[in-house]
Curated annotation (Swiss-Prot):
NCBIfam families: cyt_tran_rel (TIGR00125), nicotinate (nicotinamide) nucleotide adenylyltransferase (TIGR00482), PRK00071.1-1 (NF000839), PRK00071.1-3 (NF000840). Belongs to the NadD family. This is Probable nicotinate-nucleotide adenylyltransferase. InterPro entries: Cyt_trans-like (IPR004821), NadD/NMNAT (IPR005248), Rossmann-like_a/b/a_fold (IPR014729). It comes from Shewanella sediminis (strain HAW-EB3).
Length: 211
């Protein structure tokens, strides 16, 4: 199978995660998209709710959208979530599948700071969600790698790993930080969250502390 992977804290999961993942799936004709909550993200100090609660929210989204599956491989760890470690484990467990890791251009730019970042290209393709008109700075540390591995959505990959596939994604004006801020102030961001997530947050009195 051809499987997309979208990782994140999902604190909380919102349409800014869901809609781009669906777009990537459709444009690349992927079989599935796995939503993969982090446990202890290396680039973030902590999350606002427990790992178990974030897993429950992601599972609610997977129950609503047949295209998604919950991947809890990182959430089960007691150590920081490094992508290369996760991908090695997934490749061992699913040797016949191709993985397409989905990230924003901001994450791609910072990729050279990630743990064993070059090894990531031996384990998956990288799908980069782009904003219209955005161009990668030639002075960026990732620029040479980007130019070397770049391919397009209308080219069928002849290899199972190692490509960078840019996809223009419809802008989503949602931010987890802003959503948490609204919830703390008693505002329900109905346009940003699926109804099941809103009900879960209200039932469990989540995000009652400042974001």
């Amino acid at each position: 199978m051809r499987i997309g992977i979208l990782g994140g804290t999902f604190d909380p999961i919102h349409f800014g995660h869901i809609r781009p993942a669906l777009e990537v799936r459709d444009k690349l004709n992927l079989d599935r998209v796995w939503l993969m909550p982090n446990h202890i993200p290396p680039h973030k100090a902590s999350t606002c709710v427990s790992t178990e609660q974030r897993l429950e929210m992601v599972q609610l989204v997977c129950d609503q959208y047949d295209e998604f599956d919950l991947c809890d491989i990182e959430a089960k760890r007691d150590t920081p979530s490094y992508l290369v470690t996760t991908l090695k484990q997934l490749r061992d467990e699913h040797p016949n599948d191709e993985f397409y890791f989905i990230m924003g251009m901001d994450s791609l730019v910072s990729l050279p700071t990630w743990y064993e970042w070059r090894s990531i290209f031996t384990l998956c393709h990288i799908v980069v969600s782009e904003r219209h008109g955005w161009c990668l700075n030639p002075d960026s540390a990732i620029y040479e790698e980007y130019e070397h591995r770049l391919t397009s959505t209308n080219q069928i990959p002849s290899q199972s790993t190692g490509l960078i596939i840019p996809i223009e994604i419809a802008p989503q004006p949602y931010s987890s930080t802003e959503i948490r801020h609204q919830l703390f102030n008693g505002i329900i961001p109905e346009n940003a969250l699926p109804s099941k997530i809103i009900k879960f947050i209200q039932h469990n009195s989540l995000y009652q502390a400042p974001a």
